Curated annotation (Swiss-Prot):
Coiled coil: none
Organism: Schizosaccharomyces pombe (strain 972 / ATCC 24843)
One GO term (biological process): negative regulation of conjugation with cellular fusion
Name by which UniProt lists this protein: Negative regulator of differentiation 1
Domain of life (superkingdom): Eukaryota
SUPFAM superfamilies: RNA-binding domain, RBD
Domain RRM: 115-188, 206-277, 323-396, 414-485
Taxonomic lineage of the native organism: Eukaryota, Fungi, Dikarya, Ascomycota, Taphrinomycotina
Pfam families, sorted: RRM_1
GO CC terms in record: cytoplasm; cytoplasmic stress granule; cytosol
Phosphoserine: residues carrying this PTM: 93
UniProt region (Disordered), positions on chain: 1-26
Keyword hit for Membrane: no
Gene behind the chain: nrd1
Amino acid sequence: MSSSSPSSQSRLSVPGRTPHLPPLTIPHTVSAEGLATPNTPHALLPTGLLMGSPFVQSPTSYTSMHGLPFSTTQMAAAPAHPTTGYNVSRVTSPNVANFAPGYFPLPNNTTQPVKTVYVGNLPPNTPIDEILSCVRTGPIESAWILPEKNCAFISFLDPSHATAFFQDAALKRLTIRGTEVKVGWGKNSASNSSVLLAVQQSGACRNVFLGNLPNGITEDEIREDLEPFGPIDQIKIVTERNIAFVHFLNIAAAIKAVQELPLNPKWSKRRIYYGRDRCAVGLKQPAYFSKGQVGVVGGYPVMGYPPPSPVLQKPDLIMTGNRTVYIGNIHADTTIEEICNAVRGGLLHNIRYLQEKHICFVTFVDPVSAFRFFEMSNIHGLVIRNRRLKIGWGKHSGPLPSNIALAVAGGASRNIYIGNADDSLTIERLKEDFEEFGEIEYVNFFREKNCAFVNFTSLASAINAIDRIKQKKGYENYRISYGKDRCGNPPRTNSKSDVLSVSSDMSMPVDLVVPQQGISGFMPTNSNI
């Protein structure tokens, strides 16, 4: 059996294909609450902060579409687009090669998990939004339709989601407008690196959220302003909430819209960010619970890209890229200090405790750390004051602000170290002098070591304090720098109950760091050391 593929030029001209992207920036500013909001362009979080995470492991082998392991050597030696060894018996249509260029049935010896699904035998004039309404297995990178061939191609972010859709459509005999469609595998192609980076760091997807819309705005008006960024799949307006969701046919177009739409004076005062891909609504039970059924390793199977992050292997985080974890069912007498004593696994960007509502929102610097805390707390449970807490995902935090990312790369944390402390320095004085820079979580003083620590609820407040505290009278002779955020320590479990818990014994200096060169992860800033 033979099949023809279009030239590279014709492939690029197909509507809905992922276009070339310039170096990526994501609009944002920092609101009064310290949360990222999209308004002005800034550089993304340095990749080292995520890809350098100790939780990101390089895979030693991958799994083929038939569940057979193969090595990276075999992968590198294999052709990018296999054209021989197809199992003809698996072809869903005997004449499928004549239906659409670029279509390939499932090969026997493929060395890359395939992420593009072919949908053929479509009824004439079928709109692509009806086709995508049948997809519920995971977020889509791009989709395009060839009306003259009565077929469409759907390219997923994760090959396991493509396989799940393929199997589901084949088993249930997918029907559109009363016609049973044919499913097969499309030709594999590399994902755009800028798109992968945006998915990894910002939770980018095809869906663009529009908030704070004026009364009476229409779908036609939204389409007119957003269609220049790329082909649109669907627009949904929620009139009573003055919000809308615009699904593009590819993530690249959504990224461009999020970047450039805030620069339009008409949209400058609107809330613009990523929503949730409607094709991922079926991910109530994450795919990593059923990898054996799918037979495909999650992540991006493209040679030359970084190894997959745990964030990208968990569908809940593919959809959001979230750094904020919700904590509920908190005892009324619990203090923010006790919550921070229980949070472990990564540096905190900020923590917001709503004591009257018995809830708290913890935002990490790294989304991998947020996922790790979320997963550990749900597996082992998190207990404070003998009450098991409820753990969930908070509202999307957005990307880490660039100024915070640069400060973290230089050793910043929300903990301020004050060395050479004398008898004139007291906890009360520290609270009074530092509270002008932001909300303080707690102050710890160690007389025997002549040092103290001031922990803020926000990393931005600590950065502000480091920059300005030396200008305050009486602090000229103190050694001032960043300390160690105790929330970055490994999780602690109760060996008897295997439950994450917090000790009430605060006599140990859990955040004590004596600043000196050579300490891993510590870099004094604006200090007299």
